[in-house]
Amino acid sequence: NEVAETAQKKGIALTGEMTNYLHSLDSTRPVTCGINIFFNFLSSIGLGVYSDDKAEKSAENAEKFAAEQAKKAAAAKPEKKKKPVGSEFYNTLACLVGDYFMKCGATLYPCDLKTRDAYANMDIAGYNYGIFRYKHDLKKYPNRLILGSETFCKDAYSFWEIAKKNKRIIGDFVWAGWDYIGEVGDGAAEYSDYKFEDPSTRMTGGNGRIDLNGKPRAEAAYTRVAFERETGPFIAVDPVYQKEKLRLTGWQLTKALE
């Protein structure tokens, strides 16, 4: 999931090898991979993510790096904060520019160039935040099956309307269905007077449709209605009024409680 190597030649080849290997274990099950479409484009221009060249240089300098780290540990000097890479880079960018920008970014032409070969090496194309590409790609690739391998909660209704009209859209996974320990604060709400700066002050992502204790949130009710599994009505209550504006990330539709 969100492995940027799928934009590189070695990663594309490895995708095919892994698909074939999985087929050898069980020929009845289709293989997919969650590819962050915009993320792959960013990787191709070297922004905060993997490339074949970077990987080769890293391998060549592995021993030197280990020695430097040992010296730093011995000196016990505080290190400068590292720039985010991988999914952390994408999450940080999405929090800064918003989910709409990220979904629009996935429609750029180079995004297709940096995903099509990897998709050709699997049975089902996994789209992370690529809902704006669905209709276009269904026409361009008539044999492609599409799975929403990661989507924002607010896109549930849009997904369902497209899926009802297109049988090659086979499913949708929201990020995240259940809150989890890790990626702390990427779905959290905050006020400016309680600005999130120290990751150690939080334990969970804060973005599940179901909270860490198993209680469905208001977003779960919205999803059930959007997918025509419930008719409602559902009543949800916003957090207590504050003078400061409540800030939500793209992974959180609302902080209302059912």
Residue ranges of each PLM-predicted region?
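Short linear capping/connector segments at secondary-structure termini
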Residues: N1-E2, N36
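Active-site rim elements
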Residues: E2-K9, G206-L212
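Substrate-binding clefts and catalytic carboxylate motifs of secreted carbohydrate-active enzymes
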Residues: T15, N20-E258
